[in-house]
Amino acid sequence: MVRTPCCKAELGLKKGAWTPEEDQKLLSYLNRHGEGGWRTLPEKAGLKRCGKSCRLRWANYLRPDIKRGEFTEDEERSIISLHALHGNKWSAIARGLPGRTDNEIKNYWNTHIKKRLIKKGIDPVTHKGITSGTDKSENLPEKQNVNLTTSDHDLDNDKAKKNNKNFGLSSASFLNKVANRFGKRINQSVLSEIIGSGGPLASTSHTTNTTTTSVSVDSESVKSTSSSFAPTSNLLCHGTVATTPVSSNFDVDGNVNLTCSSSTFSDSSVNNPLMYCDNFVGNNNVDDEDTIGFSTFLNDEDFMMLEESCVENTAFMKELTRFLHEDENDVVDVTPVYERQDLFDEIDNYFG
C-alpha cells in the first residue's frame, strides 16, 4: 500500500520561512493538545502548512528543551565516538546528546568535525589513520618486485630448457639431413648401374640368383605364362652387385623363351658409399687423433649411431660442411626413361 500524502496540493499550502505569527499559532496549539497528530494539526491550528513542516519546526526550533549555542569539547568527543559506532545515523546520535537535534549535529559534523579529522590524518568514515593505507600501498611494490624477480628467474630457466631442446632437435635434424644426402647418392648410383647394364638388380656377392622368365605365345591364343625370380634382400650391402641381362630365343613352334643370365659388376660407391669424402681428410693439415674421416668413422651401422659428441668436433664439422656444400652443386646424370623404355619394363617386373 502507498501512504497517502499528508498535505493536498490543491489547498494552496505555504512554503518557505516561518513567520513569528505562524510560530505562535503552533506553540499555542501544542501547549494545549501536546505532540502528535501531525497530519491533522495544520488544519486544527489554522496553519496553511504541511504536517511535516510543522513537526520539523517544532523539533528543531520551537521545542523548549533545545540546547542553544556552541558545542563543547565533551559534546564533540561524544559525537565522534557515537559516529564511529552508528555512522551517519544522526537521530541515534542525537539521542546520546540531550538538548541537541539530529539536524544540528549533522550540520556541525560536516562543517567542523569532519574537516578537523582529515587535517589530523584520520579517516572520517573508518576513524582510522590515513597513513596506514599508504603504508599498505608502499608495501605492495616490494611484493611485486619479489614476484617479478622470481618470474624472471623462471623465464631464464625456461629459456635454458628451450635452448637445450632446440640444440637436440637441431642436431637430430642435421644428422637426418646428412643421412638423406648419403642415401640419395647411393640410390642414384645403384639406379644408374641398373639402367646402364640393361637389366634389374638380381644378386650380390653374398647370394647370386638367376632370374628366368618363360613366355609361351601361340598365334591364336596365349597358352601359358610363368615367371619366377628371387630378388635380393639388400640393395646397399657391401660387395659386388650383379644384374641379369635379357636374352631371347625362338623355338620352332613360335614360342619365345626369355632367359636372364646373371652378370656381375662392382660399384665403388656401393662398396664404400662414403669413400669420396676421404679426399677432404687427406687435404686437411690436422693431426690423426683430431681427424675424423667419413670412410673410416662412418659406415652403414655407425652412421645411424652417430653421437652428439661428433657434432661438437671442429674438424668433423668443417669436413661435413664442405661435403654438403659440394653436394648442392653435384648433378648425377641419369638416362632418360624414354631412351630405356624396354629395359624399364623389366625393372618394373622386378620391383613389382
Curated annotation (Swiss-Prot):
Expressed in vegetative parts of the plant, mainly in mature rosette leaves and in trichomes. Detected in roots, but not in mature flowers or siliques. Keywords: Activator, DNA-binding, Nucleus, Repeat, Transcription, Transcription regulation. The keyword Nucleus applies. The keyword Repeat applies. Residues 203-219 have a biased composition (Low complexity). Induction: Up-regulated by touch or wounding. CDD domains: SANT. PANTHER family: MYB FAMILY TRANSCRIPTION FACTOR (PTHR10641), TRANSCRIPTION FACTOR MYB51 (PTHR10641:SF1309). Can form complexes with MYC2, MYC3 or MYC4. This is Transcription factor MYB51. It comes from Arabidopsis thaliana. The gene is MYB51.
